[in-house]
Amino acid sequence: MRLCDHDIERWLDEKKLTITPRPPAKHINGATVDIRLGHEFRVFVGHKAPFIDLSAPKEEINHALDQIMSDKIVLKEKECFFLHPGELALAVTLESVTIPDDLVGWLDGRSSLARLGLMVHVTAHRIDPGWRGQIVLEFYNSGKLPLGLRPGMLIGALSFELLSGQAKRPYHQRQDAKYHNQKGAVASRIDKD
């Protein structure tokens, strides 16, 4: 069962679900909560590594990632990040989210942005029970023109689905939780698999 607007507000009021900063009522829709773009980005720089062998030993993967991933790019309030056609960039939500052990979250990009070619999450749109942190966005520009992105703009929406019970292995209790308490545009940690 997906939570509707008044259930989302009740869960926020009761602090079962937390979104910081708390969204104003105008950003809580029938079954979703609007989320905004944060200030941090990461991009892929140059091509010092000819490829990334995802089945290679962890050290090789980590070395390749170090060669191609930029440092954090932090924008000020009015600054604009330009995502060019065919480019992939990581960004982060302005909001930090804590999801209880009996709820799963889903991230969807905005239709208006998709119609301009912006993919907000390339594949990872599930937010596990027990998740805590900012949500990293995997932006891809599939359009024909560069897209200007500014901190604070509406970028997507979260919906929440009630599970049949408490998760036995929520994200915050997993030993292999690579992104728990995530802050900022964290790069891939595939080398931690």
From Swiss-Prot:
Gene3D superfamilies linked to this entry: 2.70.40.10
Pathway field: Pyrimidine metabolism; dUMP biosynthesis; dUMP from dCTP (dUTP route): step 1/2
S-S bridge residues: none
Its EC number(s): 3.5.4.13
Superkingdom of this protein's organism: Bacteria
Binding positions for dCTP per the UniProt entry: R110, S111, S112, L113, A114, R115, D128, V136, L137, E138, Y171, K178, Q182
Keyword tags: Hydrolase, Nucleotide metabolism, Nucleotide-binding
EC class: hydrolase
Catalytic reaction equation(s): dCTP + H2O + H(+) = dUTP + NH4(+)
Pfam families tied to this protein: DCD
GO molecular function terms attached to this record: dCTP deaminase activity; nucleotide binding
UniProt family annotation: Belongs to the dCTP deaminase family.
Its biological purpose: Catalyzes the deamination of dCTP to dUTP.
HAMAP family attached to this UniProt entry: dCTP_deaminase
Subunit record text: Homotrimer.
Name this protein carries in UniProt: dCTP deaminase
Species of origin: Hamiltonella defensa subsp. Acyrthosiphon pisum (strain 5AT)
Lineage of source species: Bacteria, Pseudomonadati, Pseudomonadota, Gammaproteobacteria, Enterobacterales
